Amino acid sequence: MSKERTRCREKVLEFLFQKDLGQEIEVDFSDFSPQGQVFAYKLYDGALYYKDLADEIISKFSKNWKLERIGTIEKNILRMAIAEMFTFSDIPQGVTVNEAVELAKKYVSPEAGRFINGILRNIVRNWDEVKKLKEGFVDVTSEN
């Protein structure tokens, strides 16, 4: 499942990137096993659900980097990793960080991998503070 999860993350990143660019997309994870589809849909939905909170967390824990200066791919990798940590408590945070770093190295550059690693490691080190931010999170996209 881990190789499939890596492919799922890549596909989720692709959809998040396209959505961020304002493109019309049809989200489809049917190429994956049933377990992979569940993982991919939950990760995609989580990344969208937690987008504003993730952006707040990224802004807080990215030293000397304003959110608008971070590239679109890198931002989406960070959002996805944060959503994964919130959504899948059974996946060790270190695995999530490593997967995010590999995505950044593959789709951006080795430097982007180091950048992503630094921010996510800072987030993990301050996880209690992150959880408090999550507790105060109000999803403004919900209709309630």
UniProtKB/Swiss-Prot annotation:
Signal peptide: none annotated. Keywords: RNA-binding, Transcription, Transcription antitermination, Transcription regulation. The keyword Transcription regulation applies. One of its GO terms (molecular function) is RNA binding. One of its GO terms (cellular component) is cytosol. GO terms for biological process: DNA-templated transcription termination; transcription antitermination. InterPro entries: NusB-like_sf (IPR035926), NusB_fam (IPR011605), NusB_RsmB_TIM44 (IPR006027). The keyword Membrane does not apply. HAMAP family: NusB. NCBIfam families: nusB. Involved in transcription antitermination. Required for transcription of ribosomal RNA (rRNA) genes. Binds specifically to the boxA antiterminator sequence of the ribosomal RNA (rrn) operons. Belongs to the NusB family. This is Transcription antitermination protein NusB. The lineage of its organism: Bacteria, Pseudomonadati, Dictyoglomota, Dictyoglomia, Dictyoglomales.
